[in-house]
Structures are given as C-alpha cells and as structure tokens.
Amino acid sequence: MQDQKQAVKRVTGAFALIDSLRRHGVQHIFGYPGGSNLPIYDEIYRAEQAGEIKHYLVRHEQGAAHAADGYARSTGKVGVCLATSGPGATNLVTGLATAYLDSVPVLAITGQVPRSALGTDAFQEIDIFGITLPIVKHSYLVREPSELPRIVVEAFHLAMSGRPGPVLIDIPKDVGNAQIDYIPVEPGSVRRVGYRPTERGNPRQINQALQLISEATKPLLYVGGGAIMAGAHAEIAELSERFQIPVTSTLMGKGRFDENHPLSLGIVGMLGMHGTAYANFAVMELDFVIAVGVRFDDRVAGTGDQFAHSAKVIHIDIDPAEVGKNRSTDVPIVGDVRQVLGDMLQRTYHWERKLSRNKPRNGTDLNQLREPIPLTVPHPEDGISPQDGDWELSHQCPDAFYTTDVGQHQMWAGQFVQNGPRRWMTSGGLGTMGYGLPAAVGVKVAHPHDTVTCISGDGSFQMNMQELGTIAQYGIGVKVIILNNGWLGMVRQWQHMFYNDRYEATNLEDGTPEFARLADVYGLEAMNVRQRKIYQRRLPKALSHKGPMILDVRVTRDEDCYPMVAPGHDNSDMMGLSS
C-alpha cells in the first residue's frame, strides 16, 4: 500500500492517456487536432518536447487510420491514430473498416463533446461509439476519467490478442481535462472479463490432422494473412519441408514463404481471381489442403465448396467464426496459428515414420504446370506495360517494403512483386482505394532506414493524394510508383468483359492532374516516364533518392489483368489463358 501511495500523482485524464500509451511503447501517433481533442494534443506537445512521442499531422483523418494500419502491419505492433469529434471521427471509419477486415491492430482515439453535452446534438457531436461497433473489436466511451489507464491497457490487449483488430476509445473533452489520482496500470496486467481467445489447438484434432497429412498424396499448404499476423513464417517453412508439402498463398498471405523455394508454387504462386493459372489448376487436383489463417473468401475460393472440391481440408484459425464458414472442413482447429503449427511439429516424428517415402508428392507435377502457363510480361514497342512496371520494380528492389492501392495495379503487384514477411501491405478485405500512400507513410515512419514503395494507379492515388503534404512536411522518404493508364482500370476491365464495352464513368484522361507537377507544387522530386528503357534507367535513381520521390509511369492504356476467374466460377475456369 505504501508503494501505491507513493506512486499516486494528481494529473489530467489526457496526461494519463499519453503516459499509458508511452508505457505501451508507443513512439508515433498519426492524427489531426480539433476542439474536442485539444486536451490530448496539449499533452502530446509535452511528450514531444520531452522526446517521448512523435506526432505526424496528416491531411485527412482517413490518412491517419491508414498510416497507423501500415505501421501496425509492418511492425506487428499496435498503430495509433487520433481524431477529433464529429467529422474528424467519421473520417476514420473507412480506415478502421480496412483494418478490421484485414485483422490489423489499430488503436483509434477520438475526442468527444463534454459529458454534459452528450445526447444534445451539440456542435460536432456524433455517436462514433455506435457507428464503429460493426468494424472494430471493441469500442469504449470513457465516462469516468479514472478509468482511462485501465481502458488503455485493455484496449491494447484486445487489439493484439486473439484475432487482431482495431479498437476505438472515445474520450469526452472534459474527461481529458479532469484531474485524477493517477496510478499507472502496467501493460498486460488487465484482462477483459469473458474474453479468452483459444490459443492452443485441441490435441486430438492435431493428431487427426497429422494422420491425414501422412496419408495424403497431393497435399497443399494454403496460407493467408492470419499466418502473417501470427508470425508463423518459420513454422510454415518447417512443416512444408518436413513433409515436402507445396505452399501457396492468398493475396494477404504474400511473404509468408520464400517464393523462390522449390516447394513454393512459383513466383508468385498466388491463388484466386487473379492468381497464377498453375496454382488455380493445381488446387483443383488436390486430395488434401492445410488451410492456415485464411477465410476462404469469394475472391480466392469462389463459391466455397467448389474450391478443392475433392480434397479433405484442415482449417487452422484463431477465430472460430471463420472455421468452416465458407468451406466445409474435415478437421477444424481453433487456435493461434503459430502455436498450433508448433504443436504439430513437436508431434511429427511418429507421423514422419509412417509417411510412405514412395508416395509421390505433387511438386514434380507443379513444376511441369508452371512451364506451359507462366505469367507473361508484355513488352510493347512504344511504351511500357503495367506488368513490366511491377516486374522491373521487384527485380531492382527485392528487399523493399511495398504498399499498394486497389485495382489492376494491385493484382499485377501481387503476381510479380516478391517480398518477405510483413513487407507487403495491401487492402485485401475491404479493397480500399487510397490506402497505399498513407499506409506507406506509416511503414516508412516505422522503418526509416528501409526502402518503402507505394504502388498505385491514377484512380487510387487521387483518393488520398493530399498526404503528399504530410510527406513533404516531415520529409518522409517514400517512393511512389503510379501506374497511370487513364482509367479506373479494374472497373473498365469488368465493363469490357461483362458489359459489352459500355465504359461509363471510368475514363480518367480528362481532369486528372499531371502528378509530377503536383509533386513539384508540394516541393517533392518527381519524374515522368513513358518508355520502358527510360523507366529502366530512371527507376534506380528514383529508388536511391534519399527523400520522397514520385514516379508517374504512363503505361499501356487497355491492358487487362489475367488470368481472371469470373465471379461464381471455380478456380479452374479462368479467362485470358492462351490455348
């Protein structure tokens, strides 16, 4: 008791908030000030003066949420964003939904009108607590200032444990100003009643899974974003090598396994609507699938049970709601992916001995598949193809962190860009145009000495191009590659394929700024590129430039992204394959 009494300090709620963030290792916050969150900003000022926390002023609150998202994905830590009440808070919504669908640990802190004004339709009052309930793991409205330290600890625990995701704390202005007796609450010391995610898989189900692995002749490890979030890269590699099981991934699972590894389904053996043909064909011939941290969503698995329709399926996921939701499962295992795979590996000796060494695995057949159905990179005589743009970028900068926006350029990047764990950031669930640039800001803040490249399109880039101001203000050295084809490219492709070339509201040739000139207005370096040879010469200079760099690459205008599985079709029914 004596120690506790000595630890008590009389402080404001805002001080307790910022000190609690600091105790969780928070060094960077992305945000935008307003009337309701000024008490918090006053404490951020003190923390910045002390060199404890750095705040980055974004140009739109959506950018703050995406920057916190990119920070979190690339580090495995909680990313923090901050907004004021009303429109500031609602501007976070798309960013929080993006993080929620991709299971990203983001802490959003919003200002709110004083408690006495709640429910009165006060200026800039909005029920952000209620608005965000479907798109966060948990929302808090802080009514008692003394509860702030506990709520922060609880929020970090919720964001990081189980299936990661965003958490929102809504703080009325008078709560931030209120004086409280502050006793710090140590990180990890608080657990939410009734919240106990299952981390260890059921031993009986793990044994059943190993039994099926030992009997399979055509197995496959199918890996998604859940494996990235769990940090299960080493366990996946060991399981694959120990049982000689080929590995493929979803768009969200890129980087989980060395794409040059003999057991990888190629560069890039990605499944789904725009996955590689050999990966999509191979999955239809399997007799066994180990699905790790995946959702079997429609862009990968089509109509669910059509996916690997002859195969038995083990589905491993931390979220019991995902197991068996879209594809029936023979052995469901609920638990932390890394823990479950680790437990499986500990038990494998017995099953390795049972594994018949003369049973062929499907690696040889897959090697044969790759040769007749490779990904192609067009080399137009006059210009540059978007595929060539992505391939050349990956070839010249293999160790970079990559963010993407959403559209054709995202799918081509998924096909051609190679990278390691936590070096690939894209909006795979919500499909948020405008994600890439602010996400790259967050990644670069977290990794100041690494190359961070945003791959965007001319449509997506205009969604959040105001964040060039943030980049300019803080000298954040991201490299932006805009694959500019003058279209909303993916929508145009669908209009071409399914709507008889009725191109309504997809032409961007008129009204789109010259991005290099726009960058110049912000005081940033930029280049225009229209020819492949010039691109090959200028790209190394752009990537090695110490500060920010924007490269406007005018690519061929009417290129379609193939292969493509039409909605509602199984993975073997692909469009755009040559006979």
From Swiss-Prot:
Q: Please state what class of enzyme this protein is.
A: transferase
Q: Which residues cross the membrane?
A: none
Q: Name one Pfam family in it.
A: TPP_enzyme_C
Q: Which UniProt keywords apply?
A: Amino-acid biosynthesis, Branched-chain amino acid biosynthesis, FAD, Flavoprotein, Magnesium, Metal-binding, Thiamine pyrophosphate, Transferase
Q: Tell me the GO molecular function terms.
A: acetolactate synthase activity; flavin adenine dinucleotide binding; magnesium ion binding; thiamine pyrophosphate binding
The cross-references to InterPro entries, in alphabetical order and at most eight, read: Acetolactate_synth_lsu, AHAS_TPP, DHS-like_NAD/FAD-binding_dom, THDP-binding, Thiamin_PyroP_enz_cen_dom, Thiamin_PyroP_enz_TPP-bd_dom, TPP_enz, TPP_enzyme_TPP-bd
- Where is it found, in Gene Ontology cellular component terms? acetolactate synthase complex
Q: Where does thiamine diphosphate bind?
A: E61
What binding details are noted for the cofactor?
Binds 1 Mg(2+) ion per subunit.
Pathway listed:
Amino-acid biosynthesis; L-isoleucine biosynthesis; L-isoleucine from 2-oxobutanoate: step 1/4; Amino-acid biosynthesis; L-valine biosynthesis; L-valine from pyruvate: step 1/4
* E.C. numbers: 2.2.1.6
Where Mg(2+) binds, per the record, is at D458, N485
Q: List the residue ranges of the region (Thiamine pyrophosphate binding).
A: 408-487
Q: Which cofactor does it need?
A: Mg(2+); thiamine diphosphate
Set out the biological process GO terms recorded for this chain's protein. isoleucine biosynthetic process; L-valine biosynthetic process
- Binding annotation for FAD: 163, 274-295, 317-336
The family database entries (SUPFAM superfamilies) matched by this protein are listed as: DHS-like NAD/FAD-binding domain (SSF52467), Thiamin diphosphate-binding fold (THDP-binding) (SSF52518)
Which chemical reaction does it catalyze? 2 pyruvate + H(+) = (2S)-2-acetolactate + CO2
The UniProt entry, under NCBIfam families, shows: acolac_lg, PRK07418.1
Q: Which family does it belong to?
A: Belongs to the TPP enzyme family.
This protein is called what?
Acetolactate synthase
